[in-house]
Curated annotation (Swiss-Prot):
Name of the featured protein: Cell division cycle protein 123
Keyword set, alphabetical order: Cell cycle, Cell division, Cytoplasm
Predominant place of localization: cytoplasm
Organism: Eremothecium gossypii (strain ATCC 10895 / CBS 109.51 / FGSC 9923 / NRRL Y-1056)
Similarity section: Belongs to the CDC123 family.
């Protein structure tokens, strides 16, 4: 592919386009080409409020690994207090939503999906709570029980933005109420090096690139095989099933590279991360002499024109900016442990001040 200089190109993204990219819009058409999943929609208002509320009350059930003696709420100072410890009348009267009491049908379906698949990875509308993985002991999206799902969704800034965007789209529409959906995908232990983002415009593959921005020395020898697999999948499978011919797809190609899994479909718009490309570049790309799209891989000591728009994103674990020490995660599962951790910190600060 080649590019030419051009003014910054605008790309319109409509509520209708977002709907077409919703998981429930394409999942049935790609069964056998995407991991199994349970889609819960529409979601009751109580569930959406629960995900978006400040603080969380987990389901108290026998066998759960979470042992909350009382609910915890983050204060404005970033510390934690019990729900009844607020200073204002509104804080003292606030009662957190309870999964078992306030949305029992959704709670039951979450448990059923986990029982069916063994473990799940959650997603709300178009956002996966990857930025909240620090809340789970395994530091991943793998949810072994319903409370894992709730912790991820409630702690994710990505999900909070998704809720806000959905409400804004609804206000600008003629629909009676906003439609939210919870997707519980069967957990797959994927190799991040083999996940790729594919950019398709007008039925043509413009280019593809790694989703994980780290260097893997074994990818370069596989470049032609991976590119062929991506092109064949887009033309033979995706374009035959999707209503639009312009989109961004996330795919996974595990060894022996004979099967391509569709993970997600995103709008061809600036709100979708271009990763190793830039959006102005994608809007002006033209086929090269061979007519082959470029598969852009992270090179060793990656610098240059592909990296200039992504400085600071290489050689780093994805979402590492959201990580916290394991002690904090474990303390967050129990109020007594949290109190003990706070006391330990205070003792250390006191010793430091005395020195």
């Amino acid at each position: 592919m080649s590019t030419e200089d051009a003014a910054l190109t605008g790309i319109a993204v409509t509520a209708e386009l977002k709907k077409k990219c919703a998981f429930s819009s394409w999942y049935e058409a790609f069964k056998g080409h995407t991991p199994r999943a349970e889609v819960i929609r529409p979601l009751p208002e109580e569930f959406v409020s629960y995900v978006d509320q400040r603080g969380i009350r987990l389901a108290r059930e026998e066998g759960s690994k979470y042992f909350y003696g009382q609910e915890l709420e983050p204060t404005t100072d970033g510390e934690y207090s019990d729900w009844e410890g607020g200073d204002s009348a509104s804080e003292r009267s606030f009662v957190p939503l309870d999964p078992v009491a306030d949305f029992p049908e959704v709670h039951a379906r979450v448990k059923q999906a986990i029982a069916r698949f063994g473990a799940v990875a959650p997603k709300l509308n178009r956002s996966a709570p990857k930025d909240a993985m620090w809340r789970l002991r395994n530091y991943s999206m793998k949810c072994n029980e319903a409370n894992d799902v709730y912790l991820l969704l409630n702690g994710s800034s990505h999900v909070a933005c998704d809720v806000s965007d959905t409400l804004l789209d609804w206000l600008a529409s003629t629909e009676d109420e906003p439609v939210m959906e919870l997707v519980l995908r069967e957990w797959l232990d994927v190799n991040p090096a083999l996940e790729f983002r594919v950019f398709v415009r007008g039925g043509e593959v413009l280019g593809a690139c790694q989703r994980d921005l780290n260097y893997y020395d074994y990818l370069k020898p596989l470049e032609e095989k991976l590119r062929t697999a991506i092109e064949d999948f887009v033309h033979d499978v995706m374009l035959q099933r999707l209503p639009d011919d312009t989109f961004v797809a996330d795919v996974y190609i595990p060894r022996p590279f004979t099967k391509v899994w569709l993970i997600d479909v995103n709008p061809f718009a600036r709100e979708t991360d271009p990763l190793l490309f830039s959006w102005n570049e994608l809007c002006t790309l033209k086929p090269n002499a061979e007519g082959q799209p470029e598969l852009r891989l992270v090179a060793e000591n990656y610098i240059g024109r592909f990296a200039e728009n992504n400085i600071g994103r290489f050689a780093a674990k994805e979402h590492s900016e959201h990580q916290v020490p394991l002690d904090v995660v474990e303390a967050g599962l129990n109020p007594q442990s949290m109190q003990k951790l706070v006391e330990t910190w205070r003792d250390l600060l006191k010793i430091q001040e005395e020195e």
